[in-house]
Amino acid sequence: MALNLRKNHQILKIINDALIDLPAPSNISTWWNFGSLLGLCLITQIITGLLLAMHYTADTNLAFSSVAHMCRDVQFGWLIRNLHANGASFFFICIYLHIGRGIYYGSYLNKETWNIGVILLLTLMATAFVGYVLPWGQMSFWGATVITNLFSAIPYIGQTLVEWAWGGFSVDNPTLTRFFALHFLLPFVIVGLTLVHLTFLHETGSNNPLGIPSDCDKIPFHPYYTIKDALGFVLMLSLLVSLALFSPNLLGDPENFTPANPLVTPPHIKPEWYFLFAYAILRSIPNKLGGVLALAASILVLFLMPLLHTSKLRSMTFRPLSQILFWTLVANVLILTWVGSQPVEHPFIIIGQLASFTYFAIILILFPLAAALENKLLKL
């Protein structure tokens, strides 16, 4: 009998085990679509980014003009640039929903998968940050100056570290060159980490909305979830293309249409929308080192999620108190995002400080307490 190539060929076998014959829970909802959507975002960003890199010049005198040239003179250059810029926003929308799903359904109990996921988030944030500097507009330049300057808060080695990162005594040509190199490199690091993320996921199998073992009721990934993912692809690409065609600058900062000028500071320096929640936490502490530590903690706190799980139930599906806290946390992050976009004045300062405190209080104190209380109430 002829061998089935799909199941016996060394390389096809890996693809088959990951995308075709993979046993998947029969009841995973649309919240489980975001992993594949993130994969699609990554592929889209790498393709559009590669096409943009062919026309971009990493030089302070030419960067801004090269981006303008791309949009004016390159075939469909305007579309490629708009897809790439807005693709980053979709990437972050998907990753935040993906993380929210993980917290709600207790997926963080797959510790290796979760920890690699947090490292992926950090790498994605680094990639987006260095990428935002490349067009060399006003917000690119001042954003780079402000954020890299935060490293100077590190005791003893801070200033040396910043000058080493800049390649000089201010953000200038060497900074732009190395940021371009990093922006080209990091997406491939993300691809590698994604493969590790999937390898660990396929060791344990996916979690499901009930948070119970699903070994007794598995279905093949193909055709059930391939078609389900395909629907997600169509919907997300439709939204991305609509945004890129109808309102490409909706999420950008008008300040970035002005070429970088070290002598003129913009009235309000702020990052792209997807960093605003962390930026609000940074600003809410009136001390440089304290702010930097809070900024780092706002993301690194995710590493603690598996350690803070006190409930006997994995998922929040049957835990109403934890659900209330979860949606309060979501509202809290939205408030932080809004505060981060506002100037540093009353009442935004105090709102930001309260929201920052609540953010850490919910994750570090209230989630474990509520879970322990629910154990008691449910007599578990």
From Swiss-Prot:
Pfam families annotated for this entry?
A: Cytochrom_B_C, Cytochrome_B
Subcellular localization is given as:
Mitochondrion inner membrane
**Which residues bind a ubiquinone per the record?**
202
GO cellular component terms, alphabetically, are:
mitochondrial inner membrane; respiratory chain complex III
Principal cellular location given in the protein's record: mitochondrion
At which positions is heme b b562 bound?
A: 84, 183
Example GO biological process? mitochondrial electron transport, ubiquinol to cytochrome c
- Bilayer topology: Multi-pass membrane protein
Q: Which CDD domains match?
A: cytochrome_b_C (cd00290), Cytochrome_b_N (cd00284)
What cofactors does the UniProt entry give for this protein? Answer: heme b
The transmembrane segments are: 34-54, 78-99, 114-134, 179-199, 227-247, 289-309, 321-341, 348-368
Per the UniProt entry, the disulfide pairs are none
Q: Which GO terms describe its molecular function?
A: metal ion binding; ubiquinol-cytochrome-c reductase activity
* Residues at which heme b b566 binds: 98, 197
Task: Tell me the cofactor note.
Answer: Binds 2 heme b groups non-covalently.
Recite the other comments: Heme 1 (or BL or b562) is low-potential and absorbs at about 562 nm, and heme 2 (or BH or b566) is high-potential and absorbs at about 566 nm.
The subunit field of the Swiss-Prot or TrEMBL record says:
The cytochrome bc1 complex contains 11 subunits: 3 respiratory subunits (MT-CYB, CYC1 and UQCRFS1), 2 core proteins (UQCRC1 and UQCRC2) and 6 low-molecular weight proteins (UQCRH/QCR6, UQCRB/QCR7, UQCRQ/QCR8, UQCR10/QCR9, UQCR11/QCR10 and a cleavage product of UQCRFS1). This cytochrome bc1 complex then forms a dimer.
What family name appears in the similarity comment? Belongs to the cytochrome b family.
Q: What is this protein called?
A: Cytochrome b
